[in-house]
């Protein structure tokens, strides 16, 4: 694959982030969209009996926040742009309703021959607790 000149608009260490307070509306809305109706997310009584002691957000919601940040990074590339195509994420701690999380990406590696940017990805809560961590991949078109 030929190297795209648009790769030059990305530099190692480039970063972006997105913060959001997770609400009941977010958890119910996400459940309705993706069909994740598991009790630990939607049923307070059920959740009280779990190791978490209260309701938690779906893990994939944290991946969605990372996708928002990937959109910020993709927007840096001039037309025809860039797209995210891979998320390797591990969930480290629960996100509770009312938590304010920050999804952050830092450009860690550029694979020029594949027109790919690889980002270190993290999601932390308001106390600095790491709730999700991994890598995300952006293809420059």
Residue ranges and their predicted role:
Residues 1-57, 141:
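Catalytic strand-loop segment that frames the active site of acyl-thioester-processing enzymes
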Residues 1-14, 91-141:
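HotDog/MaoC-like acyl-thioester-processing domains
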Residues 12-14, 18, 26, 36, ...:
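A generic structural signal for short beta-strands and their flanking turns/coil linkers
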Residues 24, 42-46, 64, 70, ...:
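Amphipathic, positively biased hydrophobic alpha-helical segments used for protein targeting
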Residues 32-36, 71-75, 126:
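Short, intrinsically disordered, mixed-charge
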Residues 50-54, 64-104:
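Hydrophobic beta-strand-centered segment that forms part of the acyl-chain substrate-binding groove
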Residues 60-61:
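A solvent-exposed, acidic/Ser-Thr-rich amphipathic alpha-helical stretch
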